[in-house]
A protein has these predicted regions:
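Conserved N-terminal glycine-rich FAD pyrophosphate-binding loop of Rossmann-like flavoproteins
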Residues: 77-99
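An anion/pyrophosphate-binding glycine-rich loop and adjacent beta-alpha core
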Residues: 282-284, 291-406
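Conserved redox-cofactor binding core of oxidoreductases
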Residues: 131-235, 255-257, 305-306, 422-442
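Glycine-rich FAD pyrophosphate-binding loop
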Residues: 65-82
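A glycine-rich dinucleotide-binding beta-alpha-beta segment and adjacent secondary-structure elements
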Residues: 410-495
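N-terminal secretory signal peptides and thylakoid transit peptides that target proteins
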Residues: 1-18
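Beta1/beta-strand and adjacent pyrophosphate-binding region of the FAD-binding site
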Residues: 40-52
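Glycine-rich loop(s) and the adjacent beta-strand/alpha-helix scaffold that form part
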Residues: 219-308, 508-511
Length: 516
């Protein structure tokens, strides 16, 4: 792996950016500010960096204890990645499973996560996530989140255990939690947009007692590295009497840091993440001694499409649609090449193999129109169909073959063989029996092209089961510093199962708010 940035990368940064990078290397030795050397502009009990699932959960829990809570969001809109995902949350033994006679267990959920994570999960964190899943569910319902009356069966899960918001979106969590938090304004709580975290303030014992920020900050996605080059905003220093919670998310949009972890990711690759998903807050925690955990494991979403930007709607239309009620096919051969409901890494690797062998030969996934999107809200389906580019509508299998350059006879034989496996209740690629349903060979069909995109950074800060960040200097918690969500590492191991991120974020956000 290339340890230093290339000359080309430095040229992209420009003179100012390269200077900032050099300055950053010097400043890394200096770490954070000392409380005795600063004058605080404001005083709070708890300061939270990030306004997504983890940040709002931590804020609501901390506020329940009577704390004055400030949530800081660097972007102009709240929620980060949390508002643009599919809204699925995996909880074992949830009420919807009970109503629909789905048998599940803590042990089965953990086993599924360990299999996807290649066994390198930090099991104490994973067990906490599973054990407190129902607490998270109840917390969300109490705060106004509305769920559908059925569970979805996502890839890598042995059974259907994923709860879904009624609008098939993470915004179904964020909006009601935000309303609850903003209603606490008269109790001294506030959420501030365009407020970027810059650094920590420590006292002489090493305790985190505050942060430096910039208000009226304007994120600039035209910069090669916003963290290094953007100097916008007015500086302030804020005191946090009880501590700071890092809930700043992952770094899938950070061109520099993600390339250091995986040099195969080109600068121009699209990502499912929002533009502000960078490593700035994570690196500041490393500077004050936080342990890094499994930072080089970056997950690609195998359900994304090259025919739309960012997260889009393909992940929802495929995961809850064509992957479940249809199949995925290699356009070169007309044959299936993977279990459509395997874990994310398995599927992404299978798709990358095809694209390495023939760049541009995007695999397709399809199902008949009667079944394809039947579990999805009309709003999501209409959004997916609106562009006219994402979802192909084909009357017959011959039409699919002609439109996407697939061998027609092989395609027909593939569908026939799949249906025979459905009838025999045995799929050649191991698709779970409960997820098998016949494809109407007569059509018509909905078709989506596939191309994996960077989606979730598996690693991050080492935390314990109290959401305390662990120091590499002492192997003990850094006093006053907590973290939750994608900025942490270890829980998911090498690859996260779909819909476990929301559970992770809510559970450890709650825990941080309870313990701070």
């Amino acid at each position: 792996m290339q340890e230093q940035m290339s000359r080309r990368d430095l040229l992209k940064l420009g003179v100012a950016g390269a200077g900032a990078l050099a300055l950053g290397a010097v400043n890394a030795q200096a770490s954070a500010l000392n409380a005795k050397d600063v004058k605080f502009d404001e005083e709070w009990d708890v300061i939270i960096i990030g306004s997504g699932f983890s940040g709002l959960a931590a804020g609501l829990k901390a506020a329940q204890k009577g704390n004055k809570v400030l949530i800081l969001e660097k972007m102009g809109r709240i929620g980060g990645n949390s508002v643009i995902n599919g809204g699925g949350m995996a909880v074992a033994n949830n009420p919807v499973q009970a109503k629909t006679n789905i048998k599940d267990s803590k042990e089965l959920f953990i086993a599924d996560c360990l299999k996807a994570g290649l066994g390198i999960n930090h099991t104490e964190l994973l067990e906490t996530l599973v054990d407190r899943g129902m607490d998270a569910y109840n917390f969300l319902v109490e705060n106004g989140v509305q769920f559908k009356e059925h569970c979805a069966h996502f890839g890598g899960h042995t059974v259907a255990r994923s709860l879904l918001t009624t609008n098939d979106s993470g915004s179904g969590y964020i909006q009601p939690m935000l309303e609850k938090f903003e209603a606490l304004k008269d109790k001294g709580c506030e959420l501030r947009r365009r407020a970027k975290f810059d650094d920590f303030v420590l006292d002489e014992s090493g305790r985190v007692v505050g942060v430096t920020i910039r208000e009226e900050y304007r994120f600039d996605d035209k910069l090669y590295s916003d963290d290094l080059e953007n100097t916008s905003g007015t500086k302030k220093t804020l005191k946090a009497n009880k501590g700071v919670v890092l809930a700043a998310g992952g770094f899938c949009r950070d061109k520099i840091f993600r390339k250091l972890q995986d040099p195969r990711i080109p600068d121009d690759v699209d990502s499912t993440n929002h533009p502000g998903a960078t490593a700035g807050a994570l690196l500041k925690a490393f500077e004050i001694g936080a342990y890094p955990v499994q930072v080089d494991w970056i997950q690609f979403g195998p359900w994304a499409s090259p025919d739309e930007k960012g997260f889009g709607t393909a992940p929802i239309l495929t995961q809850q649609g064509t992957f479940k009620y249809g199949i995925a096919v290699d356009i070169r051969t007309g044959k299936r090449f993977m279990n459509e409901l395997a874990d994310r890494k398995t599927r992404a690797d299978a798709e990358f193999k095809i694209l390495r062998e023939k760049p541009g030969a995007y695999p397709i996934t399809f199902a008949d129109t009667k079944m394809a999107f039947k579990d999805l809200s009309e709003e999501v389906v209409q959004k997916g169909m609106a562009s006219g580019k994402l979802v192909g509508e084909c009357a017959t299998l011959d039409d699919i073959a002609k439109k996407y350059g697939v061998p027609a006879d092989a395609l027909k034989e593939t569908v026939k063989k799949y249906n025979e496996g459905v009838k025999a209740k045995k799929d050649e690629f191991g698709k779970q029996e409960s997820a098998l349903s016949e494809i109407n060979e007569a059509g018509p069909f909905y078709v989506i092209r596939l191309s994996p995109k960077p989606h979730h950074t598996m690693g991050g800060l080492k935390i314990n089961t109290k959401a305390e960040v662990i120091s590499s200097k002492t192997n003990k918690p850094i006093p006053g510093l907590y973290a939750a969500g994608e900025i942490t590492g270890g829980t998911h191991g090498a690859s996260r199962l779909g819909t476990v991120a929301i559970t992770d974020c809510i559970v450890f956000g709650m825990i941080a708010g309870e313990n701070i």
